[in-house]
Curated annotation (Swiss-Prot):
Stretches of the chain forming a coiled coil according to its record: none
Matches recorded under InterPro entries: IDEAL_dom (IPR014957), UPF0302 (IPR011188), UPF0302_N (IPR014963), UPF0302_N_sf (IPR038091), Virus_scaffolding_prot_C (IPR027393)
Family: Belongs to the UPF0302 family.
Pfam families xrefs: IDEAL, UPF0302
Highest rank taxon of the organism: Bacteria
Descriptive protein name: UPF0302 protein BPUM_1989
Length: 179
């Protein structure tokens, strides 16, 4: 079972992503920045694999991978026009938006693993081997837990450096819940 990803976690990931990777289309940066500036939109954003199966999905790629630069899917229509997708996002703020990011080492990135959600729209028969799927989910859960623990440890160290007892206590409680 997957816990929901918070708006702040999604924003933090997008900031990290934009600082570490260059998207093939500049409009993609505009879209991600627009989404980050609206919490109500970020609540509807889901980072997934295979966004082409979603009712409303976007695929964005960085320069370091050999994938399509940009695609927007809505129902059974696909476009490479980023401006049309931007207008759709603006006009349909209440609809879920599924984003697939193609970048080098995506599956080894704990930052990405922390926000990656299961795509509920992938056809069931797409997975031929349930054992592989279960194993992948376990690896992903372990990776997320490790990332969260490391992040909390870093924040605890920073709180100690600042002599911030209140933040330290709060973070220590969070860490004990993860352990």
């Amino acid at each position: 079972m997957q816990t929901p990803v918070s708006v702040n976690e999604k924003k933090e990931f997008i900031r990290w992503f934009l600082n570490h990777y260059q998207l093939k289309r500049r409009e993609c940066v505009w879209i991600l920045n627009y989404l980050m500036s609206h919490d109500s939109l970020m609540e509807k954003v889901h980072f997934v694999e295979q966004a082409e199966f979603c009712p409303r999905g976007i695929i964005m790629s960085t320069h370091c991978v050999d994938e399509v630069p940009f695609r927007f899917y809505k129902e059974n229509i696909m476009t490479t026009d980023a401006e049309k997708s931007f207008h759709d996002i603006r006009l349909n703020k209440q609809q879920d938006l599924f984003i697939q990011l193609n970048f080098r080492s995506a599956y080894r990135s704990p930052e990405y693993a922390a926000v990656l959600e299961t795509n509920p729209h992938i056809p069931k028969d797409l997975y031929e081997n349930e054992k592989d799927k279960d194993l992948a989910e376990k690896v992903l859960e372990h990776s997320i837990a490790t990332f969260q623990k490391e992040r909390l440890m870093k924040e605890i160290d920073e709180a100690l450096d600042r002599h911030d007892q209140e933040t330290f206590n709060k973070l220590a409680r969070e860490l004990s819940l993860l352990s």
